[in-house]
């Protein structure tokens, strides 16, 4: 029996370059959950570890053999948003990613794993 496991990486950070290199080397695939509204953005994990996001236009070739999934435009806490903003965050991100990567985006990952029942 074949065994399957899923690898997913969030936010499109510069570290993805190395992950993709290793995945490609060993013939493995992963899902990359991206935010189209936070390109070339730095944020600090626990106020001390800088995390830099890549410019998405620079990643089209990098992610060529992997799944791209939506992760909202700006990585908000979705449980705090009104319904109209939830729809905008998800819909605009999906459309932006499909336009940039020229393929259908089917997956979605909730930022911070917090969501609303709306």
Map each language-model feature to its residues.
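A generic structural signal for alpha-helix starts
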Residues: 11-14, 84
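Active-site metal-binding loops of divalent metal-dependent hydrolases
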Residues: 9-12, 72
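N-terminal pre-catalytic segment of deacetylase/amide-hydrolase enzymes
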Residues: 1-6, 14-18, 25, 48-58
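Hydrophobic alpha-helical membrane-insertion segments
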Residues: 19-20, 80
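Hydrophobic "anchor" residues on beta-strands that sit immediately upstream
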Residues: 6-7, 67
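Metal-dependent polysaccharide deacetylase catalytic core of the NodB/CE4 family, i.e.
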Residues: 26-118
């Amino acid at each position: 029996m074949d065994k399957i496991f899923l690898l997913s990486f969030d936010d499109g950070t510069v570290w993805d370059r190395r992950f993709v290199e290793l995945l490609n080397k060993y013939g493995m695939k992963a899902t990359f959950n991206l935010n189209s509204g936070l390109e070339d953005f730095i944020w600090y994990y626990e106020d001390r570890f800088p995390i830099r996001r890549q410019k998405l236009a620079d990643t089209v070739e990098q992610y060529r053999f992997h799944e791209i999934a939506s992760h909202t435009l700006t990585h908000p806490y979705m449980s705090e948003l009104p319904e109209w903003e939830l729809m905008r965050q998800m819909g605009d991100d999906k459309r932006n990613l499909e336009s940039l990567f020229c393929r259908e985006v089917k997956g979605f990952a909730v930022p911070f794993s917090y969501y609303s029942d709306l």
